[in-house]
């Protein structure tokens, strides 16, 4: 065996996780733009937009890793010395919005849906910095010639989730309720499983071409409208399949063991995530809702 063959064999012998290790954080410019960036920390990611007058950033993603928020700010500083004007919360869940103090210290105005403000105040968590400004249905942030449209699209993964669209760049940032090319899995635990379909349809009706999800998709790729449609089709199919099982009295345990969605078995997260999807829909159809 020559040295090259030996090296290949040794690499192949490594466990998958060792081959796929990646740095704990990464900042990437969105291809085809000169001002839109994705900051990834572990399994979470956020978007920030650089303009001639300042920066619009999203979700600090500091839950369990407060130092990473400082890193996020430092990564922005590597790109631009312009002030961070806004920090936008996608929704109120702490895994996405904990740790915003470094942004607040940098002078950012924190914007979110009004329900996010109410939820944050009710939780009284010192790591969740309260909002400065809120809105109910829609708001557009305009800074340095760039517009970011913030839209509340109803109940989905939470009751406070907004999506953020860059009309010029045709980019959408949507968190948790629109995973790219994968089974939602444990994210279904607190889904509004019927209402989320309406949210996705609203997003599909908007003008955009690329989707930045709040959790990296397979290969860290950005999503497309086809990905959004595929997710909607998956949820509808899962809902109808579990409804049929519920009518046969199979919810909960039997349905989790027996219900399969072979069309989606190649999606990442299928094996571990499908039982959680079934459980959530059993919570609807198995109770006669």
State each model region's role.
Residues 1-8:
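Bacterial N-terminal signal peptides that target proteins for export
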Residues 9-18:
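Hydrophobic h-region of N-terminal signal peptides that target proteins for export
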Residues 17-20, 205-207, 219-289:
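Accessory terminal helices/loops
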Residues 28-76, 162-166, 170-176:
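Conserved beta-strand hairpin/beta-sheet module of binuclear metal-dependent hydrolase folds
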Residues 35, 49, 59, 91, ...:
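Divalent metal-coordination and catalytic microenvironments
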Residues 43-46, 55-56, 62-66, 92-97, ...:
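Solvent-exposed loop/turn segments at secondary-structure junctions
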Residues 54-56, 60-64, 140, 147, ...:
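Metallo-beta-lactamase
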Residues 74-142:
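Active-site HxH/HxHxD metal-binding segment of metal-dependent hydrolases
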């Amino acid at each position: 065996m020559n040295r090259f063959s030996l090296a290949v064999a040794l690499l192949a012998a490594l466990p998958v996780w060792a081959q796929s290790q990646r740095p704990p954080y990464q900042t990437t410019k969105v291809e085809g733009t000169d001002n839109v960036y994705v900051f990834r920390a572990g399994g979470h990611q956020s978007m920030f937009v650089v303009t001639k007058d300042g920066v619009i950033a999203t979700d600090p993603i500091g839950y369990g890793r407060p130092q990473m928020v400082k890193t996020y700010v430092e990564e922005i500083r590597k790109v631009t010395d312009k002030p961070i004007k806004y920090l936008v919360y996608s929704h109120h869940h702490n895994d996405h919005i904990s740790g915003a103090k470094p942004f607040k210290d940098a002078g950012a105005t924190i914007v979110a849906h009004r329900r996010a403000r109410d939820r944050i105040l009710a939780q009284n968590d010192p790591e969740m910095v309260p909002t400065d400004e809120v809105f109910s249905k829609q708001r557009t942030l305009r800074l340095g010639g760039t517009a970011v449209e913030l839209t509340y699209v109803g109940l989905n993964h939470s009751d406070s989730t907004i999506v953020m669209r860059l009309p010029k760049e045709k980019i959408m940032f949507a968190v948790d309720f629109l995973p790219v090319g994968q089974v939602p899995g444990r994210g279904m635990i607190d889904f509004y499983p019927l209402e989320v379909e309406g949210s996705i349809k609203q997003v599909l009706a908007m003008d955009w071409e690329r989707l930045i999800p709040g959790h990296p998709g397979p290969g860290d790729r950005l999503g497309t409208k086809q990905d959004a449609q595929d997710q909607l089709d998956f949820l509808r199919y899962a809902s109808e399949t579990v409804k049929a099982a519920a009518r046969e009295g199979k919810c909960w345990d039997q349905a989790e063991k027996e219900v399969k969605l072979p069309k989606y078995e190649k999606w990442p997260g299928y094996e571990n995530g499908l039982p959680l999807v079934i459980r959530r829909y059993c919570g609807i159809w198995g109770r006669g809702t």
